[in-house]
Amino acid sequence: MGLAFGKLFSRFFGKKDMRILMVGLDAAGKTTILYKLKLGEIVTTIPTIGFNVETVEFKNINFTVWDVGGQDKIRPLWRHYFQNTQGLIFVVDSNDRERIQEACDELTKMLNEDELRDAVLLVFCNKQDLPNAMSVAEVTDKLNLHSLRSRKWYIQSTCATSGDGLYEGLDWLSNTLTSSSK
C-alpha cells in the first residue's frame, strides 16, 4: 500500500523529466541561453563542436537540454539527437537578416523528420536587444510558422545575455508538455 501511494504521490507531485533539443544556426545564442538558464549568468562561449547538455529545473520539471552545435558542417549530426525528444527549441539570431532563410530551411528540414513528429516547437527569437533586430512578427513570417497546422508551437522574444524571455519560453514548454502528457 505504501509503495502504491508513493508512486501515486510522485506521479502528481514529483518532478517530471523532459528531453529538450536546442538547435539553430551557429552564433544564434544557444550555448549562452543554456548556461543563462542553468547558472543564471553569462558565460564566455566558443563555437560548439559537438554538444553541451545540462539539466535545468523549472516548475517541477527537470528539462534535460541538449545544445547542439550549429555550424553548417555539423548540422547533419543533429539527427542523432532526435530520438525521444519531446520539445524542440529553435534559436534564431533575429539580427541576422542574411541567414533567416537558411534558418527557415534548417527548421523545415527538421520538422519533416519522422522522429520529431510529436515534439512541440519553441522558437527563441534571440538578440532582441539589438537595434536592428527583426520583430517577433517578422521572424514568425520568415520562418513560415503559421503554416504549421499539426504541431504545437510558440515564438518568444528573448535576449540571452539579460535573460529576458527565457523563463517565459520555459513556462510555455512546461505547460504544453505537462498538459499533453496527461
From Swiss-Prot:
The keyword Lipoprotein applies. GTP binds at residues 24-31, 67-71, 126-129. Transmembrane segments: none annotated. InterPro entries: Arf1-5-like, P-loop_NTPase, Small_GTP-bd, Small_GTPase_ARF, Small_GTPase_ARF/SAR. A lipid is attached at G2 (N-myristoyl glycine). GO terms for molecular function: GTP binding; GTPase activity. Gene3D superfamilies: P-loop containing nucleotide triphosphate hydrolases. Its EC number is 3.6.5.2. It comes from the Eukaryota. GO terms for biological process: intracellular protein transport; mitotic cytokinesis; regulation of filopodium assembly; vesicle-mediated transport. It is found in: Golgi apparatus. It holds the Pfam family Arf. It catalyses: GTP + H2O = GDP + phosphate + H(+). GO terms for cellular component: cytoplasm; cytosol; Golgi apparatus; pathogen-containing vacuole; perinuclear region of cytoplasm; phagocytic vesicle; plasma membrane. Keywords: ER-Golgi transport, Golgi apparatus, GTP-binding, Hydrolase, Lipoprotein, Myristate, Nucleotide-binding, Protein transport, Transport. The keyword Metal-binding does not apply. CDD domains: Arf1_5_like. Belongs to the small GTPase superfamily. Arf family. This is ADP-ribosylation factor 1. It comes from Dictyostelium discoideum. The gene is arfA.
